[in-house]
């Protein structure tokens, strides 16, 4: 999304966090932030771009991923290969549904989008973290 300020990447929950972290650290291109949630690995590229790596979990009738404050639920999806900027990535086959579930009207630019308040598919997993986030929004 043009107005998004970071890159979000999803990996399945079976992905070994230790192996993933080691590969990222050994590349020399990223700083790994301290983990505040077992569901998300936050890194920053040397060029300053923030990247959130979300672990996706499969339940019997939904897929979900989470951060330190919220959990987002999605309709189960298949992955397809998709070419972007000369590379091939796996994306949800029905990417419109996935993006709509996570962002609402994702085609409309929203400069002050806030994943804690503007995502239609969220549920709160840590009220303390959410309150801290809300207080920061009031101050900044």
Where are these regions (language model features)?
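Acidic, metal-coordinating catalytic segment for phosphate/diphosphate chemistry
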Residues: 103-107, 127-128
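Long, contiguous hydrophobic alpha-helical segments, chiefly transmembrane helices and signal peptides
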Residues: 7-11, 91, 99
